[in-house]
From Swiss-Prot:
The reaction(s) this protein catalyses: pseudouridine(1915) in 23S rRNA + S-adenosyl-L-methionine = N(3)-methylpseudouridine(1915) in 23S rRNA + S-adenosyl-L-homocysteine + H(+)
Domain of life: Bacteria
Location relative to the cell: Cytoplasm
Gene that this sequence comes from: rlmH
Species assigned in the record: Bordetella parapertussis (strain 12822 / ATCC BAA-587 / NCTC 13253)
Main location, first listed in the record: cytoplasm
Alphabetical list of InterPro entries matching this protein: Alpha/beta_knot_MTases, RlmH-like, tRNA_m1G_MTases_N
Name of this protein: Ribosomal RNA large subunit methyltransferase H
Length: 156
């Protein structure tokens, strides 16, 4: 199974890349973590936020392989514990499909794109900066895998 994070934004601070790479390297090949950075729509183009989100949604769509199970990150999404995320990860793995986690830009994700996803996931009730979302998601996916495989990383 491949875990794909399709995230709007291309210029992240160095600490984000370092943290992302660390968690991606820890995961085994049968649960590979892959980042697909999506070019954000320029905010100076005179377009409405809805038009910008629609343009970004088209880019997100083209960045995903066919048949992938899509989960949108959204503040109104399902709130899971780490153990519940691990159980969900196991179900996804048993289903045999790759999973793409979609992360929007400054204005969020296009409503039609969210509606087309198999699920909505919320990482926190707090508003998180986009660089932090990448790192937090990578860490939680690694932790979920650790729980699933009884790896000592998660000591609950």
């Amino acid at each position: 199974m491949k875990l794909i994070v399709a995230a709007v934004g291309t210029r992240m601070p160095g600490w984000v890349e370092t943290a992302w790479d660390d968690y991606a390297k820890r995961l085994p090949a049968d649960c590979a973590l892959e980042l697909r950075e999506i070019k954000p729509e320029p905010r100076t183009s005179g377009k409405t936020p809805a038009q910008m989100m629609a343009a970004e949604a088209r880019r997100i769509e083209t960045a995903q392989p066919p048949g992938v199970l899509r989960i949108a990150l959204d503040e109104r999404g399902r709130d899971l514990t780490t153990v519940a995320l691990s159980q969900q990860l196991e179900k996804w793995r048993a289903g045999g499909r790759d999973v793409a986690f979609l992360v929007g830009g400054p204005d969020g994700l296009d409503a039609a794109l969210k509606a087309s996803c198999e699920g909505l996931l919320r990482l926190s009730s707090l508003t998180l900066p986009h660089p932090m979302v990448r790192v937090l998601l990578a860490e939680q996916l690694y932790r979920a895998w650790a729980i699933m495989t009884n790896h000592p990383y998660h000591r609950a």
